[in-house]
Amino acid sequence: MAEGLERVRISASELRGILATLAPQAGSRENMKELKEPRQRKDNRRPDLEIYKPGLSRLRNRPKTKEASGNEEFKDEIVNDRDSSAVGNDTQLIQVCKELDSQQQNGPIDAENSQAQETFPKTVGLEDRSLKIIKRSKKPDLQIYQPGRRLQTITKESAGRADEEEILNQVEQLRIEEDECKGEAIKEEVNNKPDKTEIEKHQSNDRVRTAKGEKGKKIEKGEGSKKVADDSVPGKPGSVKRYSRSDKRRNRYRTCSTSSAGSNNSAEGAGLTDNGCRRRRQDRAKERPRLKKQVSLSSTDSLDEDRVDEPDVLGSRRSSERKKHLERNWSGCGEGEQKSNGKENRSALRVTFDAETMSKDSPVVRSVKDNVDRMKSDKGPSSGGKGSEKQELRHPRQELRDRGRGILILPAHTALSVSSSGSPESTPLGPRLLFGSGSKGSRSWGRGGTTRRLWDPNNPDQKPALKSQTPQLHFLDTDDEISPTSWGDSRQAQASYYKFQNSDNPYYYPRTPGPASQYPYAGYSPLQYPVGPTNGMYPGAYYPGYPAPSGQYVCSPLPASTMSPEEIEQHVRNMQQQELHRLLRVADNQELQLSNLLSRDRISTEGMEKMAQLRTELLQLYERCILLDIEFSDSQNVDQILWKNAFYQVIEKFRQLLKDPNSENPEQIRNRLLELLDEGSDFFDSLLQKLQVTYKFKLEDYMDGLAIRSKPLRKTVKYALISAQRSMICQGDISRYREQANDTANYGKARSWYLKAQHIAPKNGRPYNQLALLAVYTRRKLDAVYYYMRSLAASNPILTAKESLMSLFEETKRKAEQMEKKQHEEFDMSPDKWRKGKKSTFRHVGDDTTRLEIWIHPSHSRSAQGTESGKDSEQENGLGSLSPSDLNKRFILSFLHAHGKLFTRIGMETFPAVAEKVLKEFQVLLQHSPSPIGSTRMLQLMTINMFAVHNSQLKDCFSEECRSVIQEQAASLGLAMFSLLVQRCTCLLKDSAKAQLSSPEDQEDQDDIKVSSFVPDLKELLPSVKVWSDWMLGYPDTWNPPPTSLDLPLQVAVDVWSTLADFCNILTAVNQSEVPLYKDPDDDLTLLILEEDRLLSGFVPLLAAPQDPCYVEKTSDKVIAADCKRVTVLKYFLEALCGQEEPLLAFKGGKYVSVAPVPDTMGKEMGSQEGKQLEDEEEDVVIEDFEEDSEAEGSGGEDDIRELRAKKLALARKIAEQQRRQEKIQAVLEDQSQMRQMELEIRPLFLVPDTNGFIDHLASLARLLESRKYILVVPLIVINELDGLAKGQETDHRAGGYARVVQEKARKSIEFLERRFESRDSCLRALTSRGNELESIAFRSEDITGQLGNNDDLILSCCLHYCKDKAKDYMPTSKEEPIRLLREVVLLTDDRNLRVKALTRNVPVRDIPAFLTWAQVG
């Protein structure tokens, strides 16, 4: 039997040698025709059902240590196969060989699958781990492909132990012969050729096995499993099952190609010869698993297309040659796994490793070793090492036999390499060619030297031809969507390229090798201060718990020589920003979850815990961004996002739950809110400390409140200070929320935080806005208006403060109107108002000052009456009787009311009256000592005045002299208050001088006033005077030329410039050198910062003011030094007034005097006549000088003379035009100046109402008639209008509700008049437009065709009928005496146009309710 086996072995080897020489010439048409013939002889079966082509099978690597013994087993099994293949029917073998050619037409035969099929494990054991060996129970020509079913065959029993020992001895002998015959490989390949009979027999034997593997017949599972279990143990006796009638034993290890033509399955291993060392090397390489190549895109590709490029050679020889080239040139990596519980294994990946690759202890190799060890342990002690290795090698073949159709997915950039440690990011060895150019070279890969490779693995340093790297191939089974994969390191090789391959964990994240974290981002360790070590390229991690960024940014370190330090810094900066962007993206995801959680109506306990966890992660992420790159955090507004996402929305949710009346546990919610606020307070305290440590600064050094510093700050410190300010604002907000949660109103702590934040960065408007909120909560309206204006007048304003100011001013307006109404009611109810000889006037402040109305009540004699030019003096005297606190409250209300009109620009017609009231109350307040207005409150008043001027300026006008009317009124109010303030300071300085003269200690310096001798009230007022002077120096265009002054009474109409001149005269006597002031710094000097400068730092209207630093000695008195600086600044300001282009002050006669032009007011000249004449003389001088210069310059030529004469004429015409204009202005001013004051002595007797008076006030008119003191004169045109309203609307049924009301009132008025005229009432008359009185209105139609004007003019003509003015009666004998007119008629109307016409004709006019109040009727 051994001789027979040797004969078969030699014959098979020689046969493969012949095929190797014939492989290059295997592409002839005759061979192609012969390849196509078997498909026609197989019962005319469909080609697509003959061979199943799923695409590619999976790859799997093999450990090197087990490969050698495995190859020896292969040789052992091959000998047995040849022994059984040598005996049989020759005719049947030839037919089977043709069928084998038919199988090979579909693609190259896969040597790995052939090897795997030959080496299935012999031990099955338990069913859940059994690997079935498929055998054929039917002839090849009777097998039919059945899709969707698994194929199983019955295996034969193994040979006896003696036969296997003899085969093993033959394998050892072959190894020895191989070592002796390495140099004679080519020669033996030519000489040693088997005979034709053996070739045909071997072809027949191989073809029978291949055909059975392709057709895939199914047998019973139980019997096949039992046979495999019996054959798994070597030497186990058993019955021999024969395949055919022949008594020859068939090979136990059949080859079946059920994967596809693209799987390149071979039929049998190559033969061995005694003299062919090269064939023996091919046989050894053939047994190694190798990488499979995809040769078909689909399982339905045409078989004819595949046959074009295939030579007509035996599949076994092709498989052997292909194994040879793979062993020499290719190495790959793959993975596979087994599935238990009795189910077949799926898609095991196989790969061939060369010696160098297998020597590496890669994770893939370790995985295969572990699998082999498990197989050994399952096999038991009776199984040898070879048996376990055979079982491992048979595993993929069994899988391929049991799989159905499938799809090969080729992801981009797939690498088949184990050069790295098995990680998914490992760099592949080089690109591979899946499809050759021209013909299908992949089909003939490894056949007769026709392989197509892009690179040589023996020369790895040589660059590949293509740079694109092929990704690892993954086979997707279409029968089962879930492909089981192993967990562990082998998972890295196939990181879920298709989405639902691993449905049990669709969110799987690939784990990196080593002790690193198994999650996408590392957990955050407790925040620490120490800075970690640096690696020379990236800055060290601020927190040791955070991973270094090197692995996240680059795959390999950059060479230090290729980049400059600037480029490295920029590169590190870019990488750091990428990390920060990643952190923000993670934070956005966390914030989205938190927002979704807070959007629920109720939050459970689990939701509270989840919310706390999300907030903690958010705080860590945001804090890390702030501490890593403060500039980036500022650009991304991380501070504000931190507060909004991690605190504000959660706090608002808790507050909403507290306000909900249906809340279940309000106390629990309040406790959680307080815990959240405490946590926020601790967090921001810690953040402030970390900012100082990280960016190396101290907050104490920047709490001086200076908006402009002498030394520029470092960039990081600047951003860190902004972040610190935001943290302080958050601290203040937390304190404010805590007070509201506890239902208390002690906002002192919150105010302290806001003030600290304001001192850090005064130009930011946010702290002022928060301080305004606290003022609103505590109902301090002046503070609220001040802080809102500060937030608007900041470098970065808070625009929402404008709406807040509007609401505040609207509320102030309502309160002011209520206060005014209350004052009038108190005055009207006073019992002795007439007994005091006082009379009321109805003159408004906006009326003409040259017109004075004296109203005399009919019940009083004239001797008891006096004159009055203002409002009721009762109110004036009442200001002095008020307490300082009440007066202060009234003044604040009036002040805010006036500024509300300036800000909203609504109701400006009454602004002069309100401004007069403000100035009166302010003047009285200044007289109190101590002043009820403190220094801080006075600064706020001056600041509000500055803001009013700043806010009312024209935005689009760039001219210096372009000022709006609102701006002039605001400037007039500010200057008026400033003049009262300066007037009070002048008086206090005189008092200080008198006090110093009376002091015996100061007899030596009687001429100078010491700063230390200032009275306390003066010290309170000096900061406000200094601040306003700074503003005037910064914005001279707003007050020079002086704006139009307000129409104020004499009591408060103070000339600003004259007052400043007096103040300058007294201020020159003050000695400000009591404490020396220095301009330059020194070691023993310290910077002197005034309190007003610190409080108003960052205020935009004051940014243009002089900001010169001042230094004093460290041992000096800072309070006196501050007053010395204020006096110095005021002296400089007063000197600047003298140095203006149009000077306002001048030093004449040893003192300062005002030279400012008189402001433009009604009834006053715009300037003195002398000033105008002086201006004209100066212009004449200029013209004369110009004429002299022009004659001198024009002497050079006649052309120049003519040009200059033309200019002279043009200038002369311009001067003449200006003179004419000035003459006209002077004429108007002279007329106004010559207009005498007019006094109207009004004794009301005739009352003339208009139509609206009867419609709206019929009852009041009836009361006037009942009083019997007045005569009611009704114009006939009024009666006609009432008839029209009463009768003309009767036919209009579509009239609205208001029209019907008017119609009804007009009807009642007509009935009232008719009833009264019928009764012959002596106090009721009717008057025509021509002045005819009627005692009856039975005939009330009047012809007015010749009359001019409208109905209002006719009504006014009725009033003029009672005005009989004669010049000899009202013209006085002296020019200084006023013109006195007597009036007994009063027009009663609400119509504004009619009132204006009446005033121009000197007709007294009042509305009916006001006249009733004055007349005390009803």
Curated annotation (Swiss-Prot):
GO cellular component: chromosome, telomeric region; ciliary basal body; cytoplasm; cytosol; exon-exon junction complex; nucleolus; nucleus; plasma membrane
Top-level class of the enzyme under EC nomenclature: hydrolase
Comp. bias regions, Basic residues: 278-293
Region (Disordered): 23-86, 102-123, 178-402, 416-468, 820-840, 856-882
Single GO molecular function: RNA endonuclease activity
Domain PINc: 1245-1396
Region (EJC-binding motif 2): 132-152
InterPro entries registered for this protein in UniProt: DNA/RNA-bd_Est1-type (IPR018834), Est1-like_N (IPR019458), Est1/Ebs1-like (IPR045153), PIN-like_dom_sf (IPR029060), PIN_dom (IPR002716), TPR-like_helical_dom_sf (IPR011990)
Modified residues (Phosphoserine): S331, S483, S830, S869, S873
Cofactor: Mn(2+)
SUPFAM superfamilies hit by this protein: PIN domain-like (SSF88723), TPR-like (SSF48452)
Oligomeric form and interacting partners: May form homooligomers. Associated component of the telomerase holoenzyme complex. Interacts with TERT, independently of the telomerase RNA. Interacts with SMG1, SMG5, SMG7, UPF1, UPF2, UPF3B and the PP2A catalytic subunits. Also interacts with the exon junction complex (EJC) composed at least of CASC3, EIF4A3, MAGOH and RBM8A; required for the process of nonsense-mediated mRNA decay. Interacts with DHX34; the interaction is RNA-independent.
Notes concerning its domains: The PINc domain confers endonuclease activity and is expected to bind the catalytic metal ion.
Protein function: Component of the telomerase ribonucleoprotein (RNP) complex that is essential for the replication of chromosome termini. May have a general role in telomere regulation. Promotes in vitro the ability of TERT to elongate telomeres. Overexpression induces telomere uncapping, chromosomal end-to-end fusions (telomeric DNA persists at the fusion points) and did not perturb TRF2 telomeric localization. Binds to the single-stranded 5'-(GTGTGG)(4)GTGT-3' telomeric DNA, but not to a telomerase RNA template component (TER).
UniProt-listed PANTHER family: SMG-7 SUPPRESSOR WITH MORPHOLOGICAL EFFECT ON GENITALIA PROTEIN 7 (PTHR15696), TELOMERASE-BINDING PROTEIN EST1A (PTHR15696:SF0)
Name the record gives this protein: Telomerase-binding protein EST1A
Origin species: Mus musculus (Mouse)
Gene behind this protein: Smg6
